[in-house]
């Protein structure tokens, strides 16, 4: 959805394809070796592949943002940018947790879970909702009236000031 919402096009998909395959091999490997004992070496290999896949994904997102036509970030894209930054931070923290004795650092794993759920997933969902929900409401309510009478723009479907307040409150909460 990010290329559509940022009006990006004409960018290579090499990093996206690499991210897809590397991430899936890493996830399949991790889920397979968890059923066996003495797989520490493979655990580190597959964890590294997962991290590498996320890095390629974030590089692809960066390329998409560099090729955008819209220079100004609207509120939905701002939420998404913060979500991807949080994904990068949680990847760093997750890598650290994976390679140390995390059972002695219980609070660190709680922080990691909080960052994933509220920093990455929630921010991304809210950001995409600011793009999708106004369109769906507009389409349902006003699409039949286009050309017959004045209809509001998509940006008029929600209060930008309240959205900015929500954005900063969510960042503060995370």
Name what the model sees in each region.
Residues 23-34, 50-60, 84-94, 120-127, ...:
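Helical transmembrane-bundle signal
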Residues 1-19, 32-42, 60-78, 96-111, ...:
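Juxtamembrane membrane-water interface segments of multi-pass membrane proteins
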Residues 20, 43-53, 116-117, 167:
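Alpha-helical transmembrane segments of polytopic membrane proteins
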């Amino acid at each position: 959805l990010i290329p559509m919402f940022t009006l990006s096009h004409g960018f290579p998909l090499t990093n996206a394809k690499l991210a897809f395959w590397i991430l899936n091999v890493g996830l399949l490997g991790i889920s397979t070796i968890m059923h066996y004992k003495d797989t520490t070496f493979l655990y580190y290999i597959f964890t590294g592949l997962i991290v590498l896949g996320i890095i390629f994904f974030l590089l692809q997102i960066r390329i998409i943002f560099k090729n955008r036509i819209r220079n100004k970030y609207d509120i939905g894209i701002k939420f998404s940018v913060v979500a991807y930054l949080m994904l990068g931070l949680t990847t760093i923290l997750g890598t650290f947790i994976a390679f140390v004795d995390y059972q002695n650092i219980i609070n660190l794993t709680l922080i990691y879970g909080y960052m994933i759920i509220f920093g990455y997933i929630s921010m991304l969902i809210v950001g995409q909702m600011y793009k999708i929900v106004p369109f769906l409401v507009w389409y349902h309510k006003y699409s039949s009236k286009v050309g017959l009478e004045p209809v509001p723009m998509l940006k008029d479907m929600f209060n930008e000031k309240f959205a900015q307040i929500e954005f900063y409150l969510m960042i503060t909460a995370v």
